[in-house]
């Protein structure tokens, strides 16, 4: 894990996005009328983590 630009509560990570995806995200932010790229990505990650947690919990329950 990168510790570059680390504060107590956040860490900066550099990632690459396909250009087309960046364009789609920018359009979504423009349609919203306001928005912040970082906030958008963080929310998308939270949704994915929640979804995977539910799937993992379901699999664990089936195994027991």
UniProtKB/Swiss-Prot annotation:
Pfam families: DUF3950 (PF13132)
InterPro entries: DUF3950 (IPR025030)
Superkingdom assignment: Bacteria
NCBIfam families: YlcI_YnfO_N
The protein's name: Uncharacterized protein YlcI
Native organism taxonomy: Bacteria, Pseudomonadati, Pseudomonadota, Gammaproteobacteria, Enterobacterales
Gene name as annotated: ylcI
């Amino acid at each position: 894990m990168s510790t570059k630009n680390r504060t107590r509560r956040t860490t900066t990570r550099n990632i690459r996005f396909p250009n087309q995806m960046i364009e789609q995200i920018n359009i979504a932010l423009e349609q919203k009328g306001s928005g912040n790229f970082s906030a958008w990505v963080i929310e998308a990650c939270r949704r994915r983590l929640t979804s995977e947690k539910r799937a993992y919990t379901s699999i664990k329950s089936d195994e027991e």
